[in-house]
Amino acid sequence: MLCNMMQAQEIKKIKIVELEKTIKESSHPMIISFWATYCVPCLEEMPYFHEMIAKYKDKGLKLLLVSLDLQEAYPKQIISVAGKVKLTAPIVWLDETDADYFCPKIDSSWSGGLPSTLFINNKTGYRRFYEDEVSRENLEKEIKAMLNLQ
């Protein structure tokens, strides 16, 4: 699986078809954060994601960070920002330029705004999409719902 193959500072270039496959075949509950280096709210919510992944690690929770940066930022700027804000989760760069093509493949309601987050648990059929910054409280609430801990 994509998450197991990657180190935090290795940033693989992927197409939407590969991301769709990762989402469909995930055997773990997963948070997929769509972000960019220029998106301040994206960077502000990252510590919450890392905190929750550590907290619910024993439940198998995984995090995948999907950069939607422009091609000029790949990979150097993404690696630089990831290091500065201490991102430790796997990072991939979505090599797609047509948001009208790839956004509906993630969620039919997605206009392309950032940050955006997809919560999935294929074992239970759980799927929830947020097109906005996620607070620490809402993030934990969503994780508990995804993991059936409520």
PLM regions with names:
Residues 34-48:
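Conserved redox-active cysteine motifs that mediate thiol-disulfide chemistry
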Residues 28, 46-67, 83:
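Conserved helix-turn-beta segment immediately C-terminal to the redox Cys motif
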Residues 81-114:
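Short, internal strand/loop/helix patches
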Residues 27-30, 35-38, 70, 113:
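Short pre-active-site segment immediately N-terminal to redox-active cysteine/selenocysteine motifs
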Residues 116-150:
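Thiol-/selenol-based redox modules, centered on thioredoxin-like
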Residues 10-29, 53:
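A short beta-strand-turn-helix
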Residues 1-14, 146, 150:
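Bacterial Sec-dependent N-terminal signal peptides
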Residues 60-75, 87-97:
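Thiol-based oxidoreductase modules, predominantly thioredoxin-like and allied folds used
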